[in-house]
Amino acid sequence: MTRVNVITGFLGSGKTTTLRHLLACKPTQERWAILVNEFGEIGIDGALLADSGAQLKEIPGGCMCCVNGLPMQIGLNMLLKTQPDRLLIEPTGLGHPKQILRLLESNVYSAWLTLQATLCLLDARQLNDERLQNNENFRDQLAAADIIVANKMDTYDGDACDALRHWQLAQGDERTLLETQHGQIDPAWLDRPRTHTTTLPDAHHHHTPSAPVSGIAALRLRPGQGWRRALNQDQGYFSCGWIFSEESVFDTIGLLEWVRLTPLLRIKGAVRIVEGTLCINRQGTDLQIETRQTPPPDSRIEVIHDAEADWNALQSALLALRIRRQETPTI
């Protein structure tokens, strides 16, 4: 029977970094799988986790919690048929956990999986953000968790530490609170039982993708297509993502400057550069970069903002950063 953990957390809390750490620490004799959902249409996390050795299914473009749309169940069924020892499920940071947990706890899957501890990653600096305090998904991700992981502790100032202590006292329960940085948690916590149950409200949201729902596969380029972009919006957040063919190679320094200076809430990417692959993960002013020698099959960049941005201007800047390029026009 497959052991399952749901790992939630709002945008920029460090879920993908935590997954990479857990996968690096997994027992060598075990087979692990990942079911990941992203708010954007492009599918960045699949590229960032591609070298993890785990079997991976992506549900891009919206919300895994929309289980009536079937992609969640299809992806889950496909992975369970391979009988992995453990399945880690990462919903989008804008997702609501209720429908996912309800599905996993249903009789339909009782013979296939054991739901273990649900973890919620928290950047305590977000506790001082009034907009997030009023966001039901932010609140309910925390409310549904068995274990709270206060991540990015190395970035906290006194106000963030105070907010974390006040929040913990206000909960009035004895749930485990882990403090860490860079998602470095002991994999043994995954074996904790699912014990914290609370009644959560139903989520209310509506996705507006720029293209038909892509199901359980990230967007791909058509033969001969140099690049394409896709848009999505929900709950007052807007995403724009681009895919570039393997013919496009980006200027490393110029791209890093674009990532650092562009006034957006969130930027993630796995991009082909002369040196191989540049992995980018920026939330606010927090920026993580990683280079890999092996180039990616294509380049993917996704941005998220809390207001609609000038996507055409951002796109023009990106296109200008290519030092080699596929000239076939996109449609």
Where are these regions (language model features)?
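Conserved beta-strand/loop subsegment of P-loop NTPase cores
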Residues: 33-34, 88, 113-123, 142-153, ...
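Flexible active-site lid/hinge loop adjacent to a nucleotide/diphosphate
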Residues: 128, 132-144, 150
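Helical mechanochemical/support elements of P-loop NTPase systems and associated helical scaffolds
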Residues: 3, 68-71, 96, 134-137, ...
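Flexible loop/N-cap segments at domain edges
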Residues: 303-304
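Alpha-helical scaffold elements adjacent to nucleotide-binding pockets in ATP/GTP-utilizing enzyme cores
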Residues: 78, 99-103, 141-144, 163-167
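Nucleotide-state-sensitive switch-loop elements of NTP-binding domains
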Residues: 2-13, 17-131
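Short, hinge-like loop/turn segments at secondary-structure boundaries
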Residues: 50-53, 106-107, 136-138, 166-168, ...
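C-terminal accessory "lid"/substrate-recognition subdomains
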Residues: 147, 155-297, 307-312, 316-331
